[in-house]
Amino acid sequence: MTEEQAQLQERADSHINYTDAINYWTETPPTVDGVLGGYGEDTVVPTMDVLGSSFFLRKLKSRMIVAQDHQKIGVDIGAGIGRVTRDMLHKFCDQIDLVEPVEPFVKQMDVELHDLKEQGKIGTIYPIGMQDWTPQEGKYWLIWCQWCVGHLPDQEFIKFLQRCKNGLQPNGTIIIKENNTPTDTDDFDDTDSSVTRCDKKFRQLFIEAGLKLIAVDRQKGLPNELYPVRMYALKPE
């Protein structure tokens, strides 16, 4: 390994550029196939993803009992076109906010989430990036972050998690569902200006943010050519 390669692996997150990421996703079709990088509804990925997430949440049911006088308010971070909210989160939450900075994706939410809006299941849509979002203190029963935190450098990710921690209800939970590298190093992808972190790095950053890992599971049934995907359930220390 050259010195340049070693530096790239050591600080993969230093190459993240928010503008490059927004430009990439703005040019991506606002469809399931687009937001999932070509693994749309003609593949097993959307179905297996929803099944895996639903199973993980059901396993956590006894550890996610809603506090007295609170509702099950969720927030979908890096929500894309609203796929996760539409297909899964609305079944677990009384109401869901969404955070998404890519304008064409936010516009597409009007289509994807139309029925849920009519049912009063959709709260506030924040058209901003994770790095600029501060949750209302004590609001959320569930903060769901899927396939998005790779756009945050390590220190920004820690700050984001700390803000999320402040946004939790009593007994609230943060869930991070993300790709992992199969090694102990992080990978930078200049296509969408994101980093894929190793499992070890995630666990380290959770500790630095003052969060305890209460459960972890690996997503099953995805194509072999994809990165491993893990779900991490977190609560404040």
What residue ranges belong to the model's regions?
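Class I (Rossmann-like) S-adenosyl-L-methionine-dependent methyltransferase catalytic domain
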Residues: 1-136, 152-163, 173-237
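A conserved beta-strand element that flanks and buttresses the S-adenosyl-L-methionine
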Residues: 144
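Hydrophobic adenine-recognition pocket in adenosine-nucleotide-binding enzymes
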Residues: 148
